[in-house]
């Protein structure tokens, strides 16, 4: 068992490897790159009930008629009866004249005319059929292009699928949450100023609504819950006159540095929110800074003289 096992195992191992390699090569040779599928498989039908279809049918009919004429010209006909030949062969002169007449008839007989006329009629019918068929396919291709353009326009005008396709019109209020792909998240009005930023409120979300111009500013203000110390609701009785005024009652002295913003939407005044901590502002105030250091530098004299 130990002596014959290596050779047998070697033979057993080689055979499946060889088979697998051959199968792999065969499969690799048989594989061919497939052409990508067409994005729009929209194709119009052939308009057979049209002038071009009628001419195509007429051409096919003419081809069949010419073919029948040619077959009739080449069809073998029987010769005359033997009794008539014996009666007509009594006079040698009449026989000679008839032979001459037969020779001329063979050259210009009805069978020869049919043989010449049949192919000509077939050619004319084939020409008409080819021209009409070409017009049929050209009309079908033109209609197919129009259908594809209509489908592309419909796909371009159709809103994207999903529950949040209208999020660009009325953004949902509240904190930021994962939204649908392709929907712009509205900016949240944070009353507390950040470091390196201006305390002026961001109004980008109020003016970035070009999709639906009918939605006025009251609808946008109603969609955003504006919360702050002493902030009255914007939907109070003051909105009945058509003017929306938003004011913020400050708790400190930082409100005097803010300025009103004119958005071009009537009389709209947006006061800057009160800052909780006035130590981190985007611009320094000279009246708030201690000018002691500047006085020391000014009254110290020349530094070179001291040295």
From Swiss-Prot:
It is found in: Membrane. InterPro entries: DUF2371_TMEM200 (IPR018787). One of its GO terms (cellular component) is membrane. Disulfide bonds: none annotated. Keywords: Glycoprotein, Membrane, Transmembrane, Transmembrane helix. Residues 22-34 have a biased composition (Basic residues). Pfam families: DUF2371 (PF10177). The chain crosses the membrane at residues 53-73, 116-136. Residues 1-38, 81-111, 180-211 are annotated as: Disordered. It is a multi-pass membrane protein. The keyword Glycoprotein applies. The keyword Acetylation does not apply. Glycans are attached at residue 88. Residues 10-20, 96-111 have a biased composition (Basic and acidic residues). Belongs to the TMEM200 family. This is Transmembrane protein 200B. It comes from Homo sapiens (Human).
